[in-house]
Amino acid sequence: MIEFRNVSKVYPNGTKGLNNINLKIQKGEFVVMVGLSGAGKSTLLRSVNRLHEITEGEIMIEGESITAAKGKGLRRMRRDIGMIFQSFNLVKRSTVLKNVLAGRVGYHSTLRTTLGLFPKEDLELAFQSLKRVNILEKAYARADELSGGQQQRVSIARALAQEAKIILADEPVASLDPLTTKQVLEDLKKINEDFGITTIVNLHSIDLARQYATRIIGLHAGEIVFDGLVEEATDEKFAEIYGDVVQKSELLEVAVK
C-alpha cells in the first residue's frame, strides 16, 4: 500500500504544488489521476519515489517511510518503483535491449553495470519483458530508430525487467496518436492485471480515464477534489475537477485530445 500522510509541497517561488494530501492506494490498484496542467498530478506522482521532495508530511510504502529513507534503504525502495515518462527517458543511441537492462542496474554494483556485465538471468528477463509488450524483434535496434509508441513500450519493458512492484506513469500517452495510445494503455492494464503491479497513471483524457481506471483521483490546485470508482466519475464530477471555468464542450475537447 502507498499512503500519503498530510503531504504538502511548496516550491521555492512560493507556489503550492500539493496541499495536505491524505491518500491510500492499495496494492494492485490501477489508479488514474486527472486534472488540468498545474493541478499537482506530476508533483504527486513523482513524490512517491522522491523525484520531487515534499515539504511536509510523510509517504509510506508497504508500511515503510520513503520520506525518511536514506542511502541504501532509499535505493532499495526505489528499486521497487518503475517510472514511465512522457518523453520515454531512453538512451537514444543505445539498443533497445540495453535500455531494458537499465532496469536491472539497481540490483548490481556500479562497476558491473557500467561495463555492461549483466548475468544470464537478467538477459532472459529483458527478453521476456520485450516479448510481453510485443517488441522483441526490436531488441537490437537503436532506440532512436523506433516510433514514439514503440519507445514507450520499451519503457514499460524496462519497468518489467526491473521487477517493479509499483509503476508510475506520468502522462505516458500525451505525445502518441490514438491507436498507439490504446496499445500502450492496454499493455499497462494487462501488466497490472497479470502481475498485480500497483499502477498510477496521470492522464488528461476523461474518456481514457473512464476506460482503463478502476479508480479515478481528481486534483485541482494541489488538492484532491474527487476520489472514487469509475462509475462515480460523472460529467458533473469532472466539471468540479477541471474547475467552474470549464464548460461541458471543453470537457469533451479535453477527452478527445
UniProtKB/Swiss-Prot annotation:
Presence of keyword Translocase: yes
GO molecular function: ABC-type phosphonate transporter activity; ATP binding; ATP hydrolysis activity
Transmembrane segments: none
Keywords, in A-Z order: ATP-binding, Cell membrane, Membrane, Nucleotide-binding, Phosphonate transport, Translocase, Transport
Keyword Ribonucleoprotein attributed: no
Main localization, broad class: membrane
Catalytic activity: phosphonate(out) + ATP + H2O = phosphonate(in) + ADP + phosphate + H(+)
Compartment annotation: Cell membrane
Residues covered by the ABC transporter domain: 2-246
Described function: Part of the ABC transporter complex PhnCDE involved in phosphonates import. Responsible for energy coupling to the transport system.
Protein name listed in UniProt: Phosphonates import ATP-binding protein PhnC
Organism field: Bacillus anthracis
